[in-house]
């Protein structure tokens, strides 16, 4: 199963992610894809570089690339992806038949 988490800041996404993690799910976020690309290109993962790296990856490979990179990394494994931000990321993740998107909210 592939679970995507979305929601506002401080909504509890990390708590939900940790719950899945204790049950053996792998975890990741779209920013992990950017960090990986930065590392491969010997670029420091500063906030500024994460932002510009994400823009560059989307420009070169399309708006769903960050999610597509995670799909490749998780290849059929049970996993949870934190901080899904765009419809294009959801569309890319739906390529897996076992994908579900959860919106996390808290009062």
Q: What does each model-found stretch correspond to?
A:
Residues 8, 20:
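P-loop (Walker A) phosphate-binding loop of NTP-binding proteins
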Residues 25-79, 84-91:
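ATP-dependent small-molecule kinase phosphotransfer cores
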């Amino acid at each position: 199963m592939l679970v995507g988490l979305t929601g506002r800041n401080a909504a509890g996404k990390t708590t939900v992610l940790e719950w899945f993690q204790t049950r053996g799910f792998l975890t990741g976020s779209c920013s992990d894809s950017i960090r990986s690309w930065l590392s491969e290109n010997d670029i420091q993962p500063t906030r500024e570089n994460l932002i510009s790296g994400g823009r560059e990856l989307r420009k070169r490979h399309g708006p769903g690339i960050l999610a597509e990179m995670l799909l490749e990394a998780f290849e059929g494994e049970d996993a949870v992806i934190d901080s899904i931000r765009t419809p294009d990321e959801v569309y890319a993740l739906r390529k897996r038949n076992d994908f579900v998107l959860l919106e996390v909210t808290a009062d």
